[in-house]
Regions:
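Structural preference for solvent-exposed beta-strand-turn elements
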Residues: 1-264
Length: 264
């Protein structure tokens, strides 16, 4: 593998992809980020058996190839590089990183042992990236931080046609936000539970794009997945198992008293 890529593009792509690298990986290869050079692009991928990240950026590829390197180490190196084009080249069991006068050598890990990333489910619709990030920020603060109650650390996503509702509660607080989105099927009706931390990270990281594509696995699928894609970045996550508490009934259908409060 041999290629040249813009320094800022590489640093941003590696930083985003390495977010999914676990701090304490159950197997050594999961500490790596997979790099694949093909055609005119560099594809970066990471996976921790729950959340996957896939990012494709433009690159001048001289020689196709695949290599696996430490994700956190590569991210640290990419941030420290000068503002010049970056050359990546596999040399035996090492990966040489050159940028201006800077030179680094990374040990190549066993790329053949790296697990295959989950397949992105069929697209269900799109939503404005900034609207999604704003709504997730307003709702996720009400999710529990207690990992012994995985249901309450998650955000309930309800889809009914062009309406998308996010809900979260920690038993003391409750937040709900309704959004309008563009479903691929206007008769779509489904629910999903996703960890608040994962949803928050995804929403924040995709705000540079106009629209975010949302995909949910069908009920007949072997595993329950949700996927998000925008601007050459794609991430999938396993959904939380279980039935979310029926918190909607806590909101009255009508009230006799209304008040408007300023936020400034």
């Amino acid at each position: 593998m041999k290629l040249r890529v813009d320094r800022d593009i590489l640093a941003e792509a590696v930083t985003w992809t390495a977010r999914s690298v676990p701090a304490r990986p159950p197997v050594p290869v999961l500490a790596g980020v997979r790099l694949e050079a093909k055609g005119s692009s560099l594809v970066l991928a990471s996976f921790d058996y729950e959340v996957s990240a896939h990012c494709e950026v433009a690159a001048d590829v001289e020689e196709d190839g695949v290599v696996l390197v430490s994700g956190r180490l590569l991210a640290d190196i990419a941030k420290a590089l000068p503002n010049k084009p970056v050359d990546l080249e596999v040399e035996g069991n090492k990966v040489a990183v050159s940028c201006g006068s800077a030179r680094f050598s990374l040990a190549a890990m066993a790329a053949d042992d790296y697990p295959a990333l989950p397949v992105m489910p069929a697209v269900d619709g799109t939503i404005d990236a900034h609207d999604l990030a704003r709504a997730v920020g307003q709702v996720s603060i009400a999710a529990s931080r207690d990992d012994t109650l995985p249901l309450l650390t998650s955000v309930q996503i309800e889809v009914e046609g062009s309406s998308l509702v996010l809900m979260a509660t920690d038993r003391y607080r409750l937040a709900m936000r309704e959004l309008t989105w563009s479903p691929s099927n206007t008769e779509l009706s489904t629910t999903a539970l996703l960890k608040a931390r994962t949803l928050s990270d995804v929403a924040k990281s995709l705000t540079s794009s106009g629209d975010v594509t949302v995909a949910l696995s069908s009920e007949s699928a072997a595993s329950s997945l949700i996927g998000f894609e925008a601007g050459g970045r794609r991430t999938t996550s396993l959904l939380t198992d279980g039935d979310y508490p029926p918190v909607r009934r806590l909101f009255p259908e009508s009230t006799s008293i209304h008040a408007t409060v300023g936020t400034d």
